[in-house]
């Protein structure tokens, strides 16, 4: 994995727009201590290290989300669609969120006030899952890209796509992965600059909480 320090917003834009590959996707982390591990795999225990137990736990959470959020969800959601919505609202799943837009990833890297180096990951094209031919997310056997329908404001505003990880406890890496690092001192500067360009809580989340956060910043 290639690692490159970023020195300014212009430097970042120049680097990401000069990358090879037409299918690049981007993901921002507020700390370089975080690996590319889905939330469902971040709390590994001896029992959950068993694949059957891991899947059972995830399905339990997903079914509970479907049941308890039924009054807020469109009817007839497929398992994939439910998984997309659940992940965007914080449920632990085997999905990782990415964006086609490098500025969205930069927002998620620098929006936190936490100290330390932030990171934007950039990955080249991965084979996609055809969700119509593979209706069960839990039978996917390799890390794959998943392209969701623009079924919610968040998915559309964030130009979202996902990767699905058959072993969510394993950190993802590849030879085509690029890691852009952002120093603590630069994070606040970049956050202010991209807000002026329209990348902020209200534009990317579009709910009352995010609008209030934008005003309060």
Regions found by a protein language model. Give the residues of each.
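Catalytic-core elements of nucleic-acid end-processing and repair enzymes
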Residues: 1-217
């Amino acid at each position: 994995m290639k690692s490159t320090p970023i020195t300014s917003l212009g430097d970042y834009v120049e680097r990401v727009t000069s990358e090879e590959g037409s299918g690049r996707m981007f993901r921002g982390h507020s700390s370089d201590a975080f690996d590319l591990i889905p939330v469902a795999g971040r709390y590994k225990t001896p029992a959950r290290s068993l694949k059957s137990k891991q899947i059972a736990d995830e399905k339990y959470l997903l079914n509970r989300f479907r049941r308890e959020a039924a009054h807020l969800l469109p009817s007839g959601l497929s398992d994939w669609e439910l998984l997309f919505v659940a992940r965007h609202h914080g449920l632990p799943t085997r999905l990782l969120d990415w964006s086609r837009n490098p500025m969205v990833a930069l927002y998620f890297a620098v929006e936190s006030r936490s100290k330390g180096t932030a990171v934007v990951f950039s990955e080249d094209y991965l084979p996609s899952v055809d969700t119509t031919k593979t209706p069960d997310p839990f039978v996917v056997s390799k890390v794959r890209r998943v392209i969701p329908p623009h079924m919610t404001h968040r998915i559309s505003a964030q130009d979202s796509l996902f990767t699905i990880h058959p072993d969510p406890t394993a950190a993802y890496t590849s030879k085509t992965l690029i890691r852009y690092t952002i120093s603590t001192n630069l994070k606040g500067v970049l956050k202010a600059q991209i807000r002026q360009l329209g990348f902020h809580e209200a534009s990317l989340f579009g709910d009352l909480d995010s609008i209030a956060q934008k005003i309060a910043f």
